[in-house]
Design a protein with these regions (language model features):
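Extreme N-terminal starter segment of soluble prokaryotic enzymes
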Residues: 1-4
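Active-site glycine-centered loops adjacent to acidic/histidine catalytic or metal-binding residues
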Residues: 8, 47-48, 83-84, 159, ...
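Core catalytic region of metal-dependent phosphoesterases/phosphodiesterases
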Residues: 9, 13-118, 187-193
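Glycine-rich phosphate-binding loop signature in dinucleotide/nucleotide-binding domains
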Residues: 35-39, 74, 146-152, 232-234
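Proline-centered loop/turn at the N-terminus of a beta-strand
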Residues: 42, 77-79, 153-155, 194-195, ...
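Short, well-ordered beta-strand micro-motif
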Residues: 115-117, 124, 232-234
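Binuclear metal-dependent hydrolase catalytic cores centered on His/Asp/Glu-rich metal-binding motifs
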Residues: 119-186
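Conserved beta-sheet core of the metallophosphoesterase superfamily
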Residues: 163, 168-234
Length: 235
């Protein structure tokens, strides 16, 4: 199966007074065009659409709906993880992606295990989104409680922190919320063949077995050396 991943759009970001939305939008739509061009089976968003309290948040929400609509029209389902910048910490459990529930083809998974594809050609997906404090969960306990056939393909996608990783602008310049860590040891012990893909970090890299998608644009001056764009995998 062909999978395309895009993450950390931060469509409301401003760098030294310069609104970056147009650049973010261009990068996002490049990932969508690529997904359609290769006839991708699934499109994943790895979290951090925008902060919920900014006056510019509506544009990011509009962009998310546009992406979901275009992908659905091309027959490509999209799965959207909530990131630490998306959550609304008012006790309601809300987030910036909530309205996508009305978009055809768009799914926002809770912490859960599900399958994508057909009964003959499918992958198991384990989603580890960031959640508001009112809906917090223990990622280690969640992984240890799963029963998935290790002979079938498993993808774990999350928007969590990685212990020991070199902090980048997502931590130093754009911090938000609490730290919730990837259960990498638990995943490796229970599902040794699982492929792990993560959002949250803006620099594309692989750390502790997790393939970081990276942001769709260089959001701060410290990200000038980053490779931005989207990630493609075939499983």
């Amino acid at each position: 199966m062909k999978l395309v991943f895009s993450s950390d759009w931060h469509g409301d970001v401003i760098t030294q007074g310069v609104d970056r939305y147009d650049e973010v939008e261009e990068g996002v739509m490049e990932s969508v065009k690529h997904a359609i061009a290769i006839n991708a089976d699934v499109y994943f968003f790895g979290g951090d659409l925008c902060d919920p309290h900014t006056a510019r948040a509506h544009r990011s929400v509009m962009l998310a709906h546009r992406v979901a609509y275009v992908l659905d029209a091309a027959g490509i389902p999209s799965y959207w993880l909530v990131g630490n910048h998306d959550v609304i910490e008012d006790g309601s459990g809300g987030h910036t992606l909530m309205s996508l529930g009305w978009s055809p083809g768009a799914v926002m998974p809770d912490p859960q295990w599900f399958t994508v594809g057909t009964h003959r050609d499918f992958i198991n997906v384990v989603a580890l989104p960031f959640t508001p404090t009112s809906r917090s969960y223990d990622p280690v306990e969640f992984i240890e409680g799963l029963e998935i056939d290790n002979d079938s393909p498993i993808l774990v996608i999350g928007h969590l922190n990685l212990k020991g990783i070199c902090a980048g602008s997502e931590t130093l310049d754009m911090p938000r919320g609490r730290e919730v860590f990837w259960p990498t040891d638990a995943i490796k012990a229970k599902f040794p063949r699982a492929i792990m893909v993560g959002g949250h970090y803006h620099e594309r890299q692989t750390y502790d077995g997790v393939r970081i998608i990276g942001s769709t644009a260089r959001l701060t001056y410290g990200e000038g050396h980053h490779k931005v764009g989207y990630l493609e995998l075939e499983i």
